[in-house]
């Protein structure tokens, strides 16, 4: 039996909106990565971008369990010697909560050209409003154990 490869006509992309208020960041990121890659679909193929578009709202109200909000640090490097920058998640969630959510999801997506294509379908907003009403997104809820 040959490997099934979905053709462009076989791929049915939906627009989903996820409310991140009081959702644990890691659980949000893993569920979103699955939706973006299309692993929840029967037509999944690892070499084809068949995932859905995902809009995340209320990124500023995402939850971090334990003492991660105070102790977890996000690193980035400029590429120059001595260019390592460190930002605590307290500061990151205050200044740019979209980046905190995008960084968590980016870590769960492949680091190649297909991963970059998949990440282009992710839209993250700090507040409750988003400019994608014309796409008629469906609500998607993240089910999690009470924290």
UniProtKB/Swiss-Prot annotation:
<dbReference type="GO" id="GO:0003729">
    <property type="term" value="F:mRNA binding"/>
</dbReference>
<dbReference type="GO" id="GO:0022625">
    <property type="term" value="C:cytosolic large ribosomal subunit"/>
</dbReference>
<dbReference type="InterPro" id="IPR005822">
    <property type="entry name" value="Ribosomal_uL13"/>
</dbReference>
<dbReference type="GO" id="GO:0003735">
    <property type="term" value="F:structural constituent of ribosome"/>
</dbReference>
<comment type="similarity">
    <text>Belongs to the universal ribosomal protein uL13 family.</text>
</comment>
<comment type="subunit">
    <text>Part of the 50S ribosomal subunit.</text>
</comment>
<dbReference type="InterPro" id="IPR023563">
    <property type="entry name" value="Ribosomal_uL13_CS"/>
</dbReference>
<dbReference type="Pfam" id="PF00572">
    <property type="entry name" value="Ribosomal_L13"/>
</dbReference>
<dbReference type="InterPro" id="IPR005823">
    <property type="entry name" value="Ribosomal_uL13_bac-type"/>
</dbReference>
<keyword id="KW-0689">Ribosomal protein</keyword>
<dbReference type="InterPro" id="IPR036899">
    <property type="entry name" value="Ribosomal_uL13_sf"/>
</dbReference>
<protein>
    <recommendedName>
        <fullName>Large ribosomal subunit protein uL13</fullName>
    </recommendedName>
</protein>
<dbReference type="GO" id="GO:0006412">
    <property type="term" value="P:translation"/>
</dbReference>
<keyword id="KW-0687">Ribonucleoprotein</keyword>
<comment type="function">
    <text>This protein is one of the early assembly proteins of the 50S ribosomal subunit, although it is not seen to bind rRNA by itself. It is important during the early stages of 50S assembly.</text>
</comment>
<dbReference type="GO" id="GO:0017148">
    <property type="term" value="P:negative regulation of translation"/>
</dbReference>
